[in-house]
From Swiss-Prot:
Stored InterPro entries: Aldolase_TIM (IPR013785), His_biosynth (IPR006062), HisA_bact_arch (IPR006063), Isoase_HisA-like (IPR044524), Isoase_HisA-like_bact (IPR023016), RibuloseP-bd_barrel (IPR011060)
CDD domains: HisA (cd04732)
Predominant location: cytoplasm
Catalytic activity: 1-(5-phospho-beta-D-ribosyl)-5-[(5-phospho-beta-D-ribosylamino)methylideneamino]imidazole-4-carboxamide = 5-[(5-phospho-1-deoxy-D-ribulos-1-ylimino)methylamino]-1-(5-phospho-beta-D-ribosyl)imidazole-4-carboxamide
Homology family: Belongs to the HisA/HisF family.
Provenance organism: Leptospira interrogans serogroup Icterohaemorrhagiae serovar copenhageni (strain Fiocruz L1-130)
NCBIfam families on file: 1-(5-phosphoribosyl)-5-[(5-phosphoribosylamino)methylideneamino]imidazole-4-carboxamide isomerase
Alphabetical list of HAMAP family matching this protein: HisA
Record's GO cellular component terms: cytoplasm
Enzyme class: isomerase
Pathway assigned to this chain's UniProt record: Amino-acid biosynthesis; L-histidine biosynthesis; L-histidine from 5-phospho-alpha-D-ribose 1-diphosphate: step 4/9
Database matches in SUPFAM superfamilies: Ribulose-phoshate binding barrel
Protein name: 1-(5-phosphoribosyl)-5-[(5-phosphoribosylamino)methylideneamino] imidazole-4-carboxamide isomerase
Amino acid sequence: MIVIPAIDLFDNCAVRLFKGNYEEKKIYSSEPWKLAESFAKNGATLLHLVDLNGARNQLGVNEDSILKIRETTSLKVQLGGGIRDKEKLAYYDKIGINRFILGTAAVTNPDLLKYALDNYGKERVVVAVDARDGIVKIAGWEKDSGIHYRDLLERLVKAGIEHIVFTDIAQDGTLAGPNLEAYREILNSYPFQVIASGGIASLKDLMDLSSLKTKISLYGVITGKALYEGKLDLAKAISSI
């Protein structure tokens, strides 16, 4: 299991939301590329980068920051938020983004999902499954899809998806701990390489996730707020897992 630091971009700043609420966001840095550099120095190999403006269909707002992060860090970057057409995929491929995260498009545009798989390969396509009370949320977590996450996971198996990020939105940004039961269920029921996201507050949370007794082990875990609030030491976390 790998530890994956996160940067969520809103208006070119690194922010964290509370339970996905844009009205409850906290700004941590106006120079997010410096955060990425510090993550690399502390031993991270992969960065989870989210364009929150893009997720709400406010396209292009964070492009300068995304490009600067890509140009200044040695980290591999997986990027999501607003990837809803072939042109955006092609642009991010051109600037060197390593993995593309599709959330809304994976629910509403299966043709684009197939296109991404066919043209960029299964290792570079990740689907974000973001759920609140079991129902998948889309469009920056602001709209209900009407689909239970289990039904979406079944679709993704049939589509040939291998990598997912699963977020329990009710835990995200709360530092209240991860939803262990949800991850236990998914890892025992589906063949995905799963990245856990939401609620991580301590090294104990990471250890609890890494020690789940499941058919498939977690591929990775995303942490953001715990790093920014000083509750989790990235270098120690990486060396401990």
